[in-house]
Amino acid sequence: MTPKLVIYTDGACRGNPGPGGWGALLMYGDKKKEIMGGDLATTNNRMELMAAIQALEALNKPTKAELHTDSQYVMKGVTQWIHGWKAKGWKTADKSPVKNVDLWQRLDAARARHEVDWRWVKGHAGHVHNERADELARLGMLKTLGERGSGKAV
């Protein structure tokens, strides 16, 4: 049986807005890849979106993936809200511009290349892979700030 690609993503922010980071853990069978990054001036929602975007953009061919996020914003946005936003020219129900439209459009393009099964996971609930994605997001933020991380290899 062919293993499936499983992805866990998370974002972190010190202040909102403030410096932030994103992290993603990609697992295929017994192989793992960890990616992270950050921004000096951002929001938690932008970092949550970036984690999913970067994970999907890291895939070099169309892939069937299961993507786990602890962000209700990302989960509801990508599975419910995005269809209406696109139909209304990237406007909300009250005709105002969609917040973070640049990232939503990028996520929409990234997911179009793949077959993604979106899954919500409760954050900070002891789920080992989600906790690792959270740690990667914090490390991404620390690296962006030029601070020392936890000392764990990434």
UniProtKB/Swiss-Prot annotation:
Keywords: Cytoplasm, Endonuclease, Hydrolase, Magnesium, Metal-binding, Nuclease. Gene3D superfamilies: Ribonuclease H-like superfamily/Ribonuclease H. Mg(2+) 1 binds at D10, E48, D70. Mg(2+) 2 binds at D10, D134. GO terms for cellular component: cytoplasm. Residues 1-142 form the RNase H type-1 domain. It catalyses: Endonucleolytic cleavage to 5'-phosphomonoester. It is found in: Cytoplasm. InterPro entries: RNase_H, RNaseH-like_sf, RNaseH_domain, RNaseH_sf, RNaseHI. GO terms for biological process: DNA replication, removal of RNA primer. Its cofactor is Mg(2+). Binds 1 Mg(2+) ion per subunit. May bind a second metal ion at a regulatory site, or after substrate binding. GO terms for molecular function: magnesium ion binding; nucleic acid binding; RNA-DNA hybrid ribonuclease activity. Its EC number is 3.1.26.4. It is an enzyme of class 3 (hydrolase). It comes from the Bacteria. HAMAP family: RNase_H. Endonuclease that specifically degrades the RNA of RNA-DNA hybrids. Belongs to the RNase H family. NCBIfam families: PRK00203.1. Monomer. This is Ribonuclease H.
